[in-house]
């Protein structure tokens, strides 16, 4: 190949095996994906701002395509690349005293699988009538009868690519943390962020192959006349749900665990002392990872599970609240009595703890199978998981950004602007997602672009909140610009 005409700098980025460069690429990529995903969420809230058809002109399929793309982009192209690929690549080698990751070239391909995956996902949304299946891609809605055309197939290939990317990354992190620690750095002395990435990597390694199998069988059902999920050929759509949620539930812990790690690091740094109950924190994360793999059917209380099965999954789900509670109170105990300077990272830590508790409490409510049957597939669930994602994982990303941007870029962020961003985002997401619990209890179903007039009040409030948080996202990019262009250089 003739590379003479291509800028050398561009090639350095393309072929880089340096963990910091790759971490930076991940962070930039996730920021772009975040813009797309946030814009899609704004479209959803504009449609739901008032009853009747607003911007999708009664096209329910298009609405569901937007919902599906929003979910996939936020989960697989914003949160995972930022927390695991971005901060994980940047700081795990530094925290364990390793010169780089164990497999630097594999690290490079892990990142470069993501842009084509995003391209495939966007393609799936814009060809024919799009993939309007929801991020769960349940058959028979995702079958070839209900979703003809290439859209769902493209979405499946996109998932395969992100899955391979995450799998390679997980192998890389496990090898790095096992084999490349500095002499004397035992497992019981690892920083909590490193622990969180290690546990996340094991969860990915355990669950992603199951997802790959599930969606590959869906692919053959659609194109090669198999009937894994088709009752007319002796298959069962509930099998898909079991396989999907065996991945899907650990996935939400994959999203939140690295955020737990960041929150632990930042809380300890601002309290100027060690994390309270270090070993308890480690074993709490291990327990969350283990329990997260044996509670998947709590997503399926409405498919007609046996009563004993429902009892088990309810009980097991509630037990996850115990290690989570240990972490919450250990963070509070870490901050307790510290001489706290209320700078932006600490504000995000406090916001994280407060809102994660709200998200956790609604989660415990939903673990009751009897209650869940009433609120399943309503906005109560949307409210719950956006509290733990939009205010758990994303607050974790912002915490890491404000805490580490000096180390990443060598420049200081403007403190006053950071605090304005925190308050804008904090107020915006709460106004957006708190009313959803009321709407869910009133029976407003998910994935439907219209609703009864009686629910217009809280929907208007929710949409107003989303405009605030959308503005705060734009403001955040202004802060990034100011930091990189005009930011004061850090001391060392």
UniProtKB/Swiss-Prot annotation:
Query: Which residues are involved in binding O2?
Result: 253
What PANTHER family does its record include? CYTOCHROME C OXIDASE SUBUNIT 1
Q: Cite the PROSITE patterns for this sequence.
A: COX1, COX1_CUB
Against CDD domains, the record matches this protein to: Cyt_c_Oxidase_I (cd01663)
Report the source organism: Phytophthora megasperma
The name on file for this protein is Cytochrome c oxidase subunit 1
Covalent link location (1'-histidyl-3'-tyrosine (His-Tyr)): 249-253
How would you summarize the oligomeric state and partners of this protein?
A: Component of the cytochrome c oxidase (complex IV, CIV), a multisubunit enzyme composed of a catalytic core of 3 subunits and several supernumerary subunits. The complex exists as a monomer or a dimer and forms supercomplexes (SCs) in the inner mitochondrial membrane with ubiquinol-cytochrome c oxidoreductase (cytochrome b-c1 complex, complex III, CIII).
Function (record text): Component of the cytochrome c oxidase, the last enzyme in the mitochondrial electron transport chain which drives oxidative phosphorylation. The respiratory chain contains 3 multisubunit complexes succinate dehydrogenase (complex II, CII), ubiquinol-cytochrome c oxidoreductase (cytochrome b-c1 complex, complex III, CIII) and cytochrome c oxidase (complex IV, CIV), that cooperate to transfer electrons derived from NADH and succinate to molecular oxygen, creating an electrochemical gradient over the inner membrane that drives transmembrane transport and the ATP synthase.
Q: Where is Ca(2+) bound in this sequence?
A: 47, 52, 449
Localization annotation: Mitochondrion inner membrane
Q: Which residues bind Fe(II)-heme a?
A: 70, 386
Instruction: List, alphabetically, the InterPro entries matched.
Output: Cyt_c_oxase-like_su1_dom, Cyt_c_oxase-like_su1_sf, Cyt_C_Oxase_1, Cyt_c_Oxase_su1_BS, Cyt_c_oxase_su1_dom
Q: How is the cofactor bound?
A: Binds 2 heme A groups non-covalently per subunit.
């Amino acid at each position: 190949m003739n590379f003479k005409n291509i800028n050398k700098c561009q090639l350095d980025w393309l072929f880089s095996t340096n963990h910091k460069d790759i971490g930076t690429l991940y962070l930039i990529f996730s920021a772009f994906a975040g813009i797309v995903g946030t814009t899609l969420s704004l479209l959803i809230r504009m449609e739901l701002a008032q009853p009747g058809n607003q911007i999708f002109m009664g096209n329910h399929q298009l609405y569901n395509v937007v919902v599906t793309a929003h979910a996939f982009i936020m989960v697989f192209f914003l949160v995972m690349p930022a927390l695991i690929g971005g901060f994980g690549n940047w700081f795990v080698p530094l925290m364990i005293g390793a010169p780089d990751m164990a497999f630097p070239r594999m690290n490079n391909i892990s990142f470069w699988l993501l842009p084509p995956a995003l391209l495939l996902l966007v393609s799936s949304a814009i060809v024919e009538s799009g993939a309007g299946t929801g991020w769960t891609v349940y058959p028979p809605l995702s079958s070839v009868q209900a979703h003809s055309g290439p859209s769902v197939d493209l979405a499946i290939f996109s998932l395969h690519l992100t899955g391979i990317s995450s799998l390679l990354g997980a192998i890389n992190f496990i090898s790095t943390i096992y084999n490349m620690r500095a002499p004397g750095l035992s497992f019981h002395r690892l920083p909590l962020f490193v622990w969180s990435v290690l546990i996340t990597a094991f969860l990915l390694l355990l669950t992603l192959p199951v997802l790959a199998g599930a969606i590959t069988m869906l692919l053959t059902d659609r194109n090669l006349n198999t009937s894994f999920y088709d009752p007319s050929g002796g298959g069962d759509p509930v099998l898909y749900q079991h396989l999907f949620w065996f991945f899907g539930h650990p996935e939400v812990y994959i999203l939140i665990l690295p955020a737990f790690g960041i929150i632990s690091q930042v809380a300890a740094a601002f309290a100027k002392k060690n994390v309270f109950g270090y070993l308890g924190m480690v074993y709490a994360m291990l327990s969350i990872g283990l329990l997260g793999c044996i509670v998947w059917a709590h997503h399926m209380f409405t498919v007609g599970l046996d009563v004993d099965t429902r009892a088990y999954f309810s009980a097991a789900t509630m037990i996850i609240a115990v290690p989570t509670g240990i972490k919450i109170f250990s963070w509070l105990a870490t901050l307790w009595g510290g001489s706290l300077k209320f700078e932006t990272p600490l504000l995000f830590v406090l916001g994280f703890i407060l809102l994660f508790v709200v998200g956790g409490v609604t989660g415990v409510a939903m673990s009751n199978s009897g209650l869940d049957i009433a609120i399943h597939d309503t906005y109560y669930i949307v409210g719950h998981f956006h509290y733990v994602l939009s205010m758990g994982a994303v607050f974790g990303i912002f915490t890491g950004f404000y805490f580490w941007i000096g180390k990443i870029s060598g420049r200081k962020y403007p403190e006053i602007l950071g605090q304005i961003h925190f308050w804008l985002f904090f107020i915006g997401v709460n106004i957006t997602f708190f009313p959803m619990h009321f709407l869910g209890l009133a029976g407003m179903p998910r994935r439907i672009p219209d609703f009864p007039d009686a629910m217009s009040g809280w929907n208007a409030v929710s949409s107003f909140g989303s405009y605030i948080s959308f503005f705060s996202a734009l403001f955040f990019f202004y802060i990034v610009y100011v930091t990189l262009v005009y930011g004061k250089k850090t001391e060392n």
